């Protein structure tokens, strides 16, 4: 005769087991729920969210897959150090920069248009970062076409960064982290304007030389 494979629990044991299961489900749900931080919508309860996004690196033009792969490794390393987030960066095949993305008057590519094209591919479980060596621009501070190192939209799911205005290529990961933090955490610039903070507003004159990570204030806001 085939035996039934179950264990009979007392009422007290059943209630204890049921309570533990409910608690586990609640923790798992809270780990990936949205939360507001200092007025900014944050994708996860904290940066150790159970479901970190996949970061897709999209090279454009002559930005090679090897360059993107090296940058991806740097991002994974530094974001793990700063946020204890184990992200997976995946490099996509390079795409051409379409003429429709260019401001032909100044031979610059519109960063906002690049972001919109990337955002169309993104969802709540991934982030796209566009990579280019070409000059990119946006409308900011009363300027119709201002050259920038990078741009993100808050809230958003994509950003773009360019090496064109980065004086030291070893600082490019910092520029990329800056835009990633805007995008992933929907976090604005450092309120303290700390010159050592990666989230300091460059105000048209970016300098990442002495920036290694976030200042104490930004860490506290993001609850790191």
Where are the language model's segments positioned?
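Cysteine-centered motifs
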Residues: 5, 24-25
């Amino acid at each position: 005769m085939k035996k039934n494979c179950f264990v009979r629990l007392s009422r007290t044991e059943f209630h204890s087991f049921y309570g533990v299961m409910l608690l586990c489900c609640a923790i798992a749900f809270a780990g990936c729920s949205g939360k507001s931080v200092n007025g900014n919508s944050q994708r996860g309860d904290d940066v150790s969210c159970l479901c970190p996004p996949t970061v897709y690196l999209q090279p454009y033009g002559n930005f090679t897959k090897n360059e993107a792969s090296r940058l991806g490794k740097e991002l994974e390393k530094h974001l793990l150090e700063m946020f204890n987030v184990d992200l997976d960066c995946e490099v996509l095949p390079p795409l051409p920069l379409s003429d429709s993305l260019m401001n032909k008057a100044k031979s610059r590519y519109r960063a906002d248009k690049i972001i919109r094209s990337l955002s169309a591919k993104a969802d709540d479980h991934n982030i796209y970062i566009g990579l280019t060596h070409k000059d990119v621009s946006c409308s900011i501070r009363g300027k119709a076409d201002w050259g920038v190192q990078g741009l993100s939209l808050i809230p958003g799911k994509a950003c773009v960064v360019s090496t064109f205005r980065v004086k030291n290529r070893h600082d490019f990961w910092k520029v990329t982290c800056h835009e990633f933090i805007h995008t992933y955490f929907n976090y604005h610039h450092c309120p303290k304007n700390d010159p050592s903070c990666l989230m300091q507003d460059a105000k048209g004159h970016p300098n990442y030389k002495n920036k290694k990570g976030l200042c104490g204030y930004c860490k506290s806001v993001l609850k790191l």
